[in-house]
Amino acid sequence: MNTDELLRQYDNGERDFILANLSDACLTERCLAAINLSQSHLANANLSGSNLQRANLSAAVLTRAMLWRSNLASASLMSTNLNEANLIRATLTGINGNGASLRKADLRLADLRGANLSQVNLVGADLRYADLTGVNLTGANLSRANFTGANLAGADLRGVMLTHTIFENTDLSDISLVEVDLSQVDLRSAILS
């Protein structure tokens, strides 16, 4: 399926595009709210500025995808591969990203308030100045992730892996750190109360 066919079918009311192959597709600034692209291949796709609210991207492959300024509020990203994806300034409020992989993803200035990111892989991810207020990160791997200037107030960090994680100037107030080893974490100027 090519992008023209997908857009035509979407405009005609179709929402299910399970297992679609849209690698390298250009779908910038499009309204694709409530689309079902679960298990689809979207590696290197450009979805910058698109409206993907309530989209189902579960188990989809979005490796190196461009999602800059995209709106993914309340989307399902369970077990989605977003390794090395560009999510700068993306809206990810209320997403279900349980088990997703975001290795080396760029999430600078992203809005992740209230997201479920339990069991997520954020190894080497860049989350500088992101808003993660009230995020569920239980059991997540945050090794080598950079949270400089981010807001994690009220986040649940029970059982996370934090090897060489950077929390410089990060708001960590009212968070749960049960079963967390902080011995190899940079907490310079972090807000802990």
Where are these regions (language model features)?
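Tandem repeat scaffolds
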Residues: N2-S193
